[in-house]
């Protein structure tokens, strides 16, 4: 992808107590290829399900496990992955 993806947003749900979330943050979300791919989206929100905003959005999107990553398009449709993903799987999910 060389141009910004039109009207797509990424929501990344996690929690401080979640081991796989911490692992994903330190190994996957810090990867330069992942950062580049995420920069192609209109927005990326990191949401803690134990905080008010994260709790509200996790209920709205029916998040039942963390980490969960959701991509929302301009029509409000979304795709969701609710488990730890390595760098390769995360990049594939973002396509």
Where are these regions (language model features)?
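Short active-site neighborhood of thiol/selenol oxidoreductases, capturing the structured segment around
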Residues: 4-17
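Thiol-based oxidoreductase modules, predominantly thioredoxin-like and allied folds used
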Residues: 13, 34-54
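The canonical Cys-X-X-Cys-His
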Residues: 18-22, 69
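Typically the conserved alpha-helix immediately C-terminal to a functionally engaged Cys/Sec
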Residues: 22-37
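A short glycine-leucine-enriched loop at secondary-structure breakpoints
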Residues: 59-64
């Amino acid at each position: 992808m060389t141009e910004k993806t039109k009207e797509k947003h990424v929501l990344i749900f996690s929690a401080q107590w979640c081991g796989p979330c911490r692992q994903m943050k330190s190994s996957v979300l810090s990867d330069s290829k992942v950062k580049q791919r995420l920069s192609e989206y209109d927005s990326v929100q990191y949401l803690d399900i134990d905080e008010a905003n994260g709790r509200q959005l996790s209920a709205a999107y029916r998040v039942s496990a963390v980490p969960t990553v959701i991509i929302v398009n301009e029509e409000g449709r979304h795709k969701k992955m609710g488990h730890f993903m390595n760098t390769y799987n995360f990049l594939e999910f973002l396509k």
